[in-house]
């Protein structure tokens, strides 16, 4: 199948990142794969160091657990891959997405992931596919970034609530409980 890879303009990938990122697509049920995002400017102060720790938890713990059941909730723009047959039918909806009747211009990575999951594709995390990206070094820029991410998370968590409740068999309460916990973490 055909695969599309996204890399943010301010990210740098490791030598084997693409090879590692596309490996899960050998399984036909995989619709998207999230890469492992690291902080490139940890030497520039306290904030990047804290963000590296937060990314470590978010990727190595949270996304790894989500990947176990094929339900990673965000394929980051910094490094992700998509099966074209999974995203082609979603492109118009994704480009023209709205929330509560208004155009939505943030959180495109969470939105496309939600749509892929809604269509019952697996979304996985590949820890060996690494990209390095710069983080803010001052609180003002950090707060703007985190507010933007949080707005997107709230919107997509509401969208995903319906997806999660429809995705799993009614008798599999453990998986439903786990996934709901991951959404609101």
Question: What residue spans do the PLM features occupy?
Answer:
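Non-transmembrane catalytic domains and loops of membrane-associated enzymes and transporters
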Residues: 1-164, 168
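Alpha-helical bilayer-embedded segments of polytopic membrane proteins, i.e.
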Residues: 169-185
